[in-house]
Amino acid sequence: MGLSDGEWQQVLNVWGKVEADIAGHGQEVLIRLFTGHPETLEKFDKFKHLKTEAEMKASEDLKKHGTVVLTALGGILKKKGHHEAELKPLAQSHATKHKIPIKYLEFISDAIIHVLHSKHPGDFGADAQGAMTKALELFRNDIAAKYKELGFQG
């Protein structure tokens, strides 16, 4: 299920565009997640009160958290599948503290793909989308394996 060198290059090329405006991308990804899957908001005490897209766009905390999420993901993607050291603490916190189900990671992966396609259609065609989808699936599968080691049935 690994990615070829060419696929990793496509992932990292588009990720460079994300990093140019990581706060904006992170905010859009979380808004897409929360509006598409409102149940995910229940895992975020500081965002539960945000009911509309306008409220979400106005939230500096949401923008900051989007930056944290995409910064962590970028660090993992840059490891090109060799992300054990980065993944372990992330899986630990998401399994034991936050109790984030794997399904929610699928939801945010879909949100990432959607946001990248809408913001960068010229740089995120079918091949790049396929590569990013594979990279995010690899990440989720590895998180799921760590969850299992930790006894979390997320």
Curated annotation (Swiss-Prot):
Domain Globin per the UniProt entry, residue ranges: 2-148
InterPro entries referenced in this protein's UniProt entry, alphabetically: Globin, Globin-like_sf, Myoglobin
Binding site for heme b: 94
Location of the protein in the cell: Cytoplasm, Sarcoplasm
PROSITE patterns named among the record's database cross-references: GLOBIN (PS01033)
Main location: cytoplasm
Binding positions (O2): 65
Record's catalysed reaction(s): Fe(III)-heme b-[protein] + nitric oxide + H2O = Fe(II)-heme b-[protein] + nitrite + 2 H(+); H2O2 + AH2 = A + 2 H2O
GO biological process, one term: removal of superoxide radicals
Record-listed E.C. numbers: 1.7.-.-, 1.11.1.-
Residues annotated for nitrite binding in this entry: 65
Alphabetical keyword list: Cytoplasm, Heme, Iron, Metal-binding, Muscle protein, Oxidoreductase, Oxygen transport, Phosphoprotein, Transport
GO terms assigned for molecular function: heme binding; metal ion binding; nitrite reductase activity; oxygen binding; oxygen carrier activity; peroxidase activity
A GO CC annotation given for this chain: sarcoplasm
Principal EC category: oxidoreductase
Pfam families: Globin
Modified residues annotated as Phosphoserine in this record: 4
Its biological purpose: Monomeric heme protein which primary function is to store oxygen and facilitate its diffusion within muscle tissues. Reversibly binds oxygen through a pentacoordinated heme iron and enables its timely and efficient release as needed during periods of heightened demand. Depending on the oxidative conditions of tissues and cells, and in addition to its ability to bind oxygen, it also has a nitrite reductase activity whereby it regulates the production of bioactive nitric oxide.
Subunit-level organization: Monomeric.
Family to which the UniProt record says this protein belongs: Belongs to the globin family.
Protein name: Myoglobin
Organism (species): Equus caballus
